[in-house]
Amino acid sequence: MPNILKNRDTTGAFALIDSLVRHGVKHIFGYPGGAILPIYDELYAWEKEGFIEHILVRHEQGAAHASDGYARSTGNVGVCFATSGPGATNLVTGIATAHMDSVPMVIITGQVGRSFIGTDAFQEVDIFGITLPIVKHSYVVRETKEMGKIVAESFFIAKYGRPGPVLIDIPKDVGLEKFDYQIVNPNNINLAGCPVLKNYDQNRISQAANLIKQSSQPLLYIGGGAVTSNSHNEINELINLVKIPVATTLMGKGIIDESHPLSLGMLGMHGTVYANYAVSECDLLIALGARFDDRVTGKLDEFACHAQVIHVDIDPAEIGKNRTPQIGIVGEIKDFVRDLIECLKNDINFDSEQSQAWRSRIIRWRKEYPLLVPKNINNLSPQEVIHEISTEATNAYFTTDVGQHQMWAAQFIKTSQKRWITSAGLGTMGYGLPAAIGVQIAHPNEQVICISGDASFQMNIQELGTVSQYGLPIKIFIINNKWQGMVRQWQQAFYGERYSHSNMEKGAPNFTKVAEAFGLRSLKIKSRNDLKLRIKEALDYDGPILVDIQVIADENCYPMVAPGKSNAQMMGINS
């Protein structure tokens, strides 16, 4: 350790930063303030010595989303800082986003001094209580000597089993207090009460294999848990062995190469026709790391209603929560799939050709109901734009905001595991840009693309300042239809075309000038003649760039499963 750090007082703040470094933390996203200043003062010395880097965002919500994007793209724990009061409450949406999508994060907030807690002191907020429903665990550090242990436990909890966010609230005087700091080994954490992560044996594997052998119309249903488990290789081996079609959720996107003949793309509300038909007609549904949420299932009692279900998840609370399976497996998806493959390989009675007629039927659906890229004579369609971006950008990381553009991106962008970063469960507008910042910090030599809408982008537009300050070469594409597009679509379809406060044209900023005000390069695309050339120009540019793309205002995102309808009852398709 350099002398500048050896000679520092071992305060609570020192213990915190030292513990973070020992846990391999390289980057922190945050915004300083009064209650957390002792920690920022300590951070100053550690940054100066190159141990760690802090990324200054322009709003605490941006810090939460950036650490979220960092975590999703690396598989490591994302870390963010904020001060007490409004600084802490500004994190709440980002914490909830991570909680809904099972993202490992450690959130560190400043708090008023211990003697002031409960007195309504300046910038005092009970962030511990506020966030209880949206974290895996929370701590208030009341004893400075507990700092190292609390940090170690927080990292363990954030990653153990089903990942999620953990909050550490640190009173100001704890950060300042000197004490005899005892280093806690990050590898020596063993918390009592942690649930067993496996409930199956070889007999359960054999039962699952028997269901596969009996099935003539099987389907794999892959969720975000499969991505988190790093089971890409095992799942692809299973797909090729069984010759089983696979549909993914929004979070499961990337687990299989979407050009694979057995890939059906996304299922659910805006899924492909053939994925939704397949789940409606299958006789066996194997759900891996998926939670049967409403946006996937449509009318729940008609979801995979002809199928027996095998449900595998690391979280026992998910098994049977929305759909009772014939076989419920709690365990690591990677381990289960590996065991299942071994069982099937050793079974001389297993024949993948028994589902040949089923695969042929799906091929016919694909030909009959392809995803279409409409080309309007006078104006650009959003689908055309996103398809062109996907065609030009190879092996990029993609982040999105939330709305129509998110669904079109999910339909048309072909990407791989952990290169698709989006807010799925909470559906957080304003997520895309700060998440892209986190991804770019984590992968400085990779191309990072943020696809946003004109409404979503304005939610966290201030983070252009962070992009500018750190020279992050993010490519930002705004699909600009001058509407809250998904809201308008629902108002058109279900609310008698009463467009209550969903039009964004009046007061809309000139995005290219806003970008330029932050010192960033910008482009505007209005016609098809410019589309391919300008997109390539943006992607080839070696710095940050914002591209404002004017698209058809009233284009709707189809297919669409209306609320209360089954997945087989889709709007916007030719029947």
UniProtKB/Swiss-Prot annotation:
Its EC number(s): 2.2.1.6
Recorded metabolic or biological pathway in which this protein acts: Amino-acid biosynthesis; L-isoleucine biosynthesis; L-isoleucine from 2-oxobutanoate: step 1/4; Amino-acid biosynthesis; L-valine biosynthesis; L-valine from pyruvate: step 1/4
Residues in the signal sequence: none
Swiss-Prot/TrEMBL catalytic activity: 2 pyruvate + H(+) = (2S)-2-acetolactate + CO2
Keywords assigned: Amino-acid biosynthesis, Branched-chain amino acid biosynthesis, Chloroplast, FAD, Flavoprotein, Magnesium, Metal-binding, Plastid, Thiamine pyrophosphate, Transferase
Keyword Isomerase attributed: no
Stored SUPFAM superfamilies: DHS-like NAD/FAD-binding domain, Thiamin diphosphate-binding fold (THDP-binding)
GO cellular component entries: acetolactate synthase complex; chloroplast
Cofactor(s) for this UniProt protein: Mg(2+); thiamine diphosphate
Record's subcellular location: Plastid, Chloroplast
A GO molecular function held by the record: thiamine pyrophosphate binding
Keyword Protease tagged: no
BP GO annotations: isoleucine biosynthetic process; L-valine biosynthetic process
Positions annotated to bind FAD: 162, 270-291, 313-332
Predominant cellular place of this UniProt entry's protein: plastid
Origin: domain of life: Eukaryota
InterPro entries linked to this entry: Acetolactate_synth_lsu (IPR012846), AHAS_TPP (IPR039368), DHS-like_NAD/FAD-binding_dom (IPR029035), THDP-binding (IPR029061), Thiamin_PyroP_enz_cen_dom (IPR012000), Thiamin_PyroP_enz_TPP-bd_dom (IPR012001), TPP-bd_CS (IPR000399), TPP_enz (IPR045229)
Binding locations of thiamine diphosphate: E60
Annotated region described as Thiamine pyrophosphate binding, given as residue ranges: 404-483
The protein's enzyme class: transferase
Pfam families reported in the protein's UniProt record: TPP_enzyme_C, TPP_enzyme_M, TPP_enzyme_N
Entries under PANTHER family matching the protein: ACETOLACTATE SYNTHASE CATALYTIC SUBUNIT, MITOCHONDRIAL, THIAMINE PYROPHOSPHATE ENZYMES
NCBIfam families for the chain: acolac_lg (TIGR00118), PRK07418.1 (NF005651)
Family listed: Belongs to the TPP enzyme family.
Subunit structure: Dimer of large and small chains.
Protein name: Acetolactate synthase large subunit
